[in-house]
Amino acid sequence: MKTKSFSLAIGLCLALSITAAAKTTVELKDAQGKSVGTAVLWSKTGKGAASGVFIKADLHGLPPGVHAFHFHQKALCEAPDFKSAGPHFNPEAKKHGLENPDGHHAGDMNNFTVNAKGQAKFKVVNKDVTLGDDSHSLFSNGGTALMIHAKADDLKTDPAGNAGDRIACGVITK
């Protein structure tokens, strides 16, 4: 009986060792201040946990088509152009683009598609950022922003992938 109880306790400890370390919900707004949805960001820690930040987006009211999706340097989303968010989050001072042979910004992510009804739901993991207390944290220096661009990112052109105007923005802070 003691062996079974001990085994159960070990199993429970292992199961609990992979837990959500941090979680935040980001509301994204367009240039008119209207909500276009949310993105839930979370990370996991512990033995066997995947690294990075998990993102689950539920968006609406966007133009149909393919759009770029990036983390930007500052936790500011001042309409109408959202330039206040600064450039892409880039703690290692790399060039832009997931296809760049010299590496990419930590804030670079793949494009997503908005359907004909203006909606998009997707999940993605960015393995280059954290929600911790390090230099790659989306909470560092007062926070960052999650940005949606008007066009697709070509995944290689520096500094922003020819992704066009910034059409929606959400502040990421603790």
What do the PLM-derived regions correspond to, one by one?
Residues 18-174:
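N-terminal leader/targeting pre-sequences
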Residues 9-17:
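Bacterial N-terminal signal peptides
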